[in-house]
Curated annotation (Swiss-Prot):
UniProt KW Metal-binding keyword: no
Coiled coil regions in record: none
Annotated gene: hisS
InterPro entries documented for this protein: aa-tRNA-synth_II, aa-tRNA-synth_II/BPL/LPL, Anticodon-bd, Anticodon-bd_dom_sf, His-tRNA-ligase, HisRS-like_core, HisRS/HisZ
Assembly and interaction partners: Homodimer.
Region of interest: Disordered: 1-20
Species of the source: Deinococcus geothermalis (strain DSM 11300 / CIP 105573 / AG-3a)
Protein's name according to its UniProt entry: Histidine--tRNA ligase
GO cellular component terms, A-Z: cytoplasm
HAMAP family: His_tRNA_synth
Length: 431
């Protein structure tokens, strides 16, 4: 049997590849990353990169031992001789906060805005929009508890999808309060669900003792039916004065900036480190609960990791899920452009010289060349196949006169360019 890529992964392929599966074009992937980078760096966010694997204890303490990620979805790395307790990262925030604490980034001006992108790993049940290796764009703002920072984070996430051209996106906004608020709410939920525990799914019965709020996020239709039947009160009814005031301020900022949102009292983020502001972006084109991504405030995460208290807020969206939404709306992205010039020798004697001219030309533009001599018609055909803007020919006649015959493929116009002026010709057209 032919070797296959692992289940729950994708190949990122060059433009023009035959579409045989759900693999993605690398240029579309890069376009999403570049759009996010442009939006976030205009806001002052700086790029950070952390390892693809971290200590398992970091993930357990950061993400939370009661989460599905820790209990069911982590990929453990066993084969390091010096340490057996590593896992492939299932999300980005815990690693970024670890890097912030370990490297003394608290000395930098606050809020410190950081962003990254890269692969994450979870042992998911593979379906549309859910992969075992997936890629995220991640934004974090550390060092401020101001609700204005929350609103800016939501605006930035909204701005990325707006610049990509998506229109069918909804922001679902909620608050999960402070720790005391959540403790009171969890007590209320235990009182609600304990008499009906036999009707809960196995996962939710386990959550009843560990973290009852996670029952509200259950994928079981039976659990959701029971929640409706019991008319379970939302977390918003249990917000204390401080959390309630914070939530109202976030909403006021978003309204002032014309960011459309819906209050969703059922918002329960899947990671234990969240508090206060929480939100998700939804689109019906991505399947699997329709979430493109989400975020929230996590002021207690740094202390869970053994550091001083550092307020923070962040978000992440899945690039593959965003591509599904773009596909569903028929949004197209620019394909990777071809070379400015494709250069070919007309006889074997001049192949090396043509290649040398191409190498010199690469100092100012993208230039490709033929690795063997071609007839003019074949050179033009190959240049067109590579989506080049110009085709250049070097034969005995051109070499003797010190020129290059250059054809503009779209118009068919031809001209001769002195070899010594080739880089000037390219630089003028590469702008």
């Amino acid at each position: 049997m032919a070797l296959q890529r692992p289940k729950g992964t994708q190949d990122h392929l060059p433009d023009g590849s035959p579409k045989l599966s759900r693999d993605v074009q690398a240029s579309a992937f890069a376009y999403v990353q570049d759009t996010a980078r442009r939006v976030l760096e205009r806001a002052g966010a700086q790029f950070i990169a952390t390892p693809l694997f971290e200590e398992a204890e970091l993930v357990r303490r950061g993400v939370g031992g009661s989460t599905d990620i820790v209990r069911k979805e982590m990929f453990t790395v066993y084969y390091f001789g010096d340490h057996g307790g590593y896992v492939l990262r299932p999300e980005g925030t815990a690693g970024i906060v670890r890097a912030y604490l370990q490297n003394g980034l608290k000395q930098l001006p606050a809020p410190l805005k950081l962003w990254t992108h890269g692969p994450m790993f979870r042992a998911e049940n593979v379906q549309k929009g859910r992969l075992r290796q997936f890629h995220q764009v991640d934004y974090e703002a550390l060092g401020s508890a101001d609700p204005l920072v929350d609103a800016e984070a939501i605006w930035l996430m909204w701005e990325v999808v707006r610049e990509l051209g998506l229109t069918g996106v909804r922001v679902k906004l909620g608050s999960i309060g402070d720790p005391a608020d959540r403790e009171a709410y969890n007590a209320y939920l235990r009182d609600c669900f304990t008499p009906h525990a036999a009707r809960l799914s196995d996962d939710s019965r386990d959550r009843l003792t560990r973290n009852p709020m996670r029952i509200l996020d259950s994928k079981s239709t039976g659990d959701q039916a029971l929640i409706g039947e019991l008319q379970v009160k939302p977390m918003l009814d249990f917000l204390g004065e401080a959390a309630s005031s914070h939530f109202a301020a976030v909403q006021a900022y978003l309204r002032a900036w014309n960011v459309p949102f819906d209050i969703d009292p059922a918002i329960v983020r899947g990671l234990d480190y969240y508090r206060r502001t929480a939100w998700e972006l939804h689109h019906q084109g991505v399947g699997a609960k329709s979430a493109l991504g989400g975020g929230g405030r996590y002021d207690g995460l740094s202390t869970q990791l053994g550091g001083p208290e550092v307020p923070g807020i962040g978000w992440a969206f899945g690039i593959e899920r965003l591509l599904l939404a773009l596909e569903a709306e028929g949004v197209t992205f620019p394909e990777e452009s071809g070379p400015l010039l494709f250069l070919a020798a007309l006889d074997e004697e001049h192949v090396a010289r043509a290649a040398g001219l191409a190498l010199e030309g690469r100092r100012v533009a993208r230039v490709e060349f033929a690795y063997r001599a071609l007839k003019p018609a074949n050179a033009f055909k190959e240049a067109d196949r590579r989506r080049a803007r110009y085709a250049g020919l070097l034969g005995s006649d051109e070499a003797e006169r010190g020129v290059l015959t250059i054809k503009h493929l779209a118009s068919g116009e031809q001209q001769e360019v002195p070899l010594a002026a080739l880089n000037t010709f390219l630089a003028e057209r590469a702008r």
